[in-house]
Every structure is written in C-alpha cells, then in structure tokens.
Amino acid sequence: MKIKLGVIFTCLLMMVFSAAAQQAEIDTRNPYTMVEQVGNRTFERMKNSKAQIKENPELLRTIMEEELLPYIDYQYSAFKVLGKHFDFKKADKEKLIEYIRVFRQYLITSYADALSYYDEQEVIFAPEQDFDGDKSATIRAVIRDGKRPDISVAFKVRKSGKADEWKAYDMVAEGISMLQNEIRQYEPIIRTEGIDKVI
C-alpha cells in the first residue's frame, strides 16, 4: 500500500502501549487502562515468543493482528485518510472494502516492523482524567530512556456508540499527528486521482 506512516510513529505507538502489569482481560470501557493493558499483553506475548519469532518472523505479524489490532479503530482511520470530501455514496463499494482491507494489513506490517526499535523504554503516563460522558479522549505520556531527551506523546482514542468501547485511532508525537500527516499527504491524491492510487 502506498500509504506509509513514519516508523517513528509506529515505534512510539508501541511504546505508549506498554504497561506495568498484565491483565487477563482488556477493559475497553476505560481508555486509560485499555491502552496500558493492550501494550502489556502484546509485549508479554512477544517476550514469551522470542525464540519462535526469531525462527519465524511472520509470527510477529500474527501477534500484532491478534493482540493489538482489535483495539485500533483502523476503519475510522482509513476513512479519515480518504478525506472529508470523499463521496462514499458514489464510491465503488468493492474498492472501498479492498482499501480498508489493505489499510488494515498495512497497519499490521507497520507495527510489526517498528517493534525492532523498541528497547523497553520507560513510559510515564499523565494522571487519568475524567472521561465520563465523553466520546473521545487524549491520553498523554512521556517516553524516557535516559539516553535522549524525553519524547512527549498523546494517544487519541474514541468511543464507539454501538459497542460502548474505546479504541485508538491516532498518535501525536511532539505535536505531530500521524493521522493528520497522512491526511495532508494522501487526501489530495485520492480526491483527484481516486482510491486506486492508494491501494
């Protein structure tokens, strides 16, 4: 897929998903605990599968798909990249479905590729804020490894009205939005040349 998110963003995304304690189930009703729990479970499985991943790198993609992707609102992100002027009513439904499928697979690959940059850096979360009644939230954190300046990140999540659960859709690192960056880069191409250009 021609849509290419920066490696630094996917790396930071994985760092923000790290947590202090493993949980048996993910609490998607609380965006703060959801982010921490997802990361912890993902990295715990990676740690336990280190030897198998070395033998079969494709296993890392499987882990991303099973542990991380269920908590990413990839369809919402994919639609945002299409742009506000995209005419969904006139769009070829089969192409739209294929676009979402390719976008999903791209995210899996991006997260798997970025994991080689993660080296157990410390993630310090800002205190939980009241999100009662909100449909979106921004979870702020600082990534610290002692070798470089701290990196400020903000993880954006949204609440699904139907499922009543929170999912992630964007990452902002040092004021730069991963999603907005892709919208600025690809929305004009989609608008003028069509969805085929990004599949």
Where are these regions (language model features)?
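Bacterial N-terminal signal peptides
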Residues: 8-16
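Short beta-strand edge/turn micro-motifs at domain boundaries
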Residues: 150-180
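Low-complexity, intrinsically disordered terminal/linker segments enriched in charged
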Residues: 170-199
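A beta-rich soluble binding module of mature secreted/lumenal proteins
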Residues: 136, 141, 150-158, 190-199
